Amino acid sequence: MKKVYILLPLLFLIYWSCEDTKEEEPIYTFVKTFGANGGDIGRSVQQTADGGYIITGKAGCGVDGGGVWLLKTNSQGIEEWSNLLTNAYGCNNGDGEGRWIQQTTDGGYVIVGTAFPDFYDEYHDYPRTILLIKTDSQGQVEWKQNFGGIDYGLFDDSEGRFVQQTDDGGFILTGYTYSTKNHTNDVWLIKTDANGNEEWNRTLGDSIYFQWNAGGDEEPMPYALNDRGSSVQQTSDGGYIIGGYSTGWCFDSDWRITCKSNVLLIKTDSRGDREWLKSFGESKAGEFHRGHSVQITPDGGYIIAGERAIGNEASNFWLIKTDINGNQIWDKTYGNGGER
């Protein structure tokens, strides 16, 4: 049986210094589990203005069905209330999943995730859509919006990964969508007003066909990149910075599947038009680099958290620091024996 776990006070803790340090065991303030249906998943947590915590994710299939789950606790992790925000199709695919949550300026919450249609199947023959939900302070739904799907193009499969409230009271969200132009996934950036109505959307990235083989040399073999947005922040100039990654699949001369993956950092203006794109990680088949979160640093640059792996080795935590123009200043790898 799967349950949602919340471990506080820290989700991730990184130590680095010029001196050797002894690894210390974490001290937990509390550990709580929520859910009893099986298949319950916690995806995002944020501390709220009252010192408690708000969690979103996916509820498994139980008496009330499944779907996007919202749960509020006090400062000690004791549940205050929980709401199932989507349950249109009962237990069929769980109906949806929350991927990121933020408390809004009015004390309510905004959740972005993915909605599954009632006819969705494991082969993705029918499209998922990005789901945006706004609730009041008690988790009662005020409105829902969907982006993507057949209205945007047949078999347009989309997934929402991150949302942030913008300075004008609206929302900026990112994830990915299937591009009918390139026949690959593109980073999708969507701007809405305060009621979730779309103001504009942009597909970003470099989803083009390449020539590559398993040894890293150019060969006349098919190759395509799939770009995905993982995180977005509004910048001081009114534009946006998006962190994510680009993955690719190809076949070598013996028709063996090979692949690669790079971290992406994309800067746009206030209308979502791309100003620049930076890629991090060596562009060789068999190397994996993924960006999962980006933050703006006090010096105006950016810090990216992600993962990297080469060949068959396990992935390691990867931290990249850039200047305001996305040029790498330094990077650090943690795991499998410490900092490198």
Language model features with spans:
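Bacterial Sec-dependent N-terminal signal peptides
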Residues: 1-27
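A sequence-level/structural motif corresponding to short, flexible coil/turn segments enriched
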Residues: 18-340
